[in-house]
């Protein structure tokens, strides 16, 4: 079954609407159980942490747009793939948006000190976290930097100008 944004699947006493929420991955869908005003949020909104947004299939721009899109619904609860149920999803999603905006501000602050590689500042940004999380965190930082390159706030300084995980970035 192929579903697009807004497609409906229904039975005698239930209706499920698909909501395209790219970001974690380009083809991610959440599923709204209309009668219960709840959302099966999959990997887009997890019950214990923000999703890893890892390029090339993950996009921070898409992730942020999709989070804001979910705010336009009036869901009473989310059921994520990972973690517990989320009883106050609007406040929870807003906290994810704020968290990602704060991370982006952190990255901009690091880049104010000159060209840097992701590996130069991930240990500082995530020093309070288990080191095993640093590699996925680097993927999310990379997604932030790609978004900053796309929006003209940063650039790659390496010879090939390819915005990859090992590239050197600087502010524009």
Can you say where each PLM-predicted feature lies in the sequence?
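A short catalytic or substrate-binding loop motif that flags glycine-/basic-rich loops and adjacent residues
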Residues: 3, 22-25, 163
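Conserved hydrophobic "DFG−1" position in protein kinase catalytic cores
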Residues: 11, 31-33, 156, 171
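C-terminal regulatory/interaction regions
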Residues: 109-172
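Alpha-helix-centered segments that form part of catalytic cores
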Residues: 1-12
């Amino acid at each position: 079954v192929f579903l697009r944004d807004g497609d409906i699947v229904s039975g005698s006493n239930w209706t499920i609407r698909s909501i395209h929420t790219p970001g974690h991955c380009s083809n991610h869908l959440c599923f709204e159980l209309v009668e219960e005003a709840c959302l099966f949020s999959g990997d887009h909104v997890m019950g214990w942490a923000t999703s890893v947004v890892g390029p090339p299939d993950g996009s921070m721009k898409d992730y942020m747009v999709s989070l804001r899109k979910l705010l336009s619904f009036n869901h009473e609860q989310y059921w994520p793939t990972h973690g517990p149920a989320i009883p106050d999803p609007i406040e929870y999603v807003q906290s994810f948006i704020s968290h990602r905006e704060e991370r982006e501000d952190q990255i901009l602050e690091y880049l104010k000190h000159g060209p840097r590689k992701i590996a130069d500042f991930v240990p500082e940004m995530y020093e309070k976290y288990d080191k095993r999380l640093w590699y996925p965190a680097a993927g999310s930082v990379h997604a932030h930097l790609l978004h900053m390159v796309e929006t003209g706030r940063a650039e790659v300084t390496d010879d090939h100008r390819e915005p990859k995980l090992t590239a050197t970035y600087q502010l524009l």
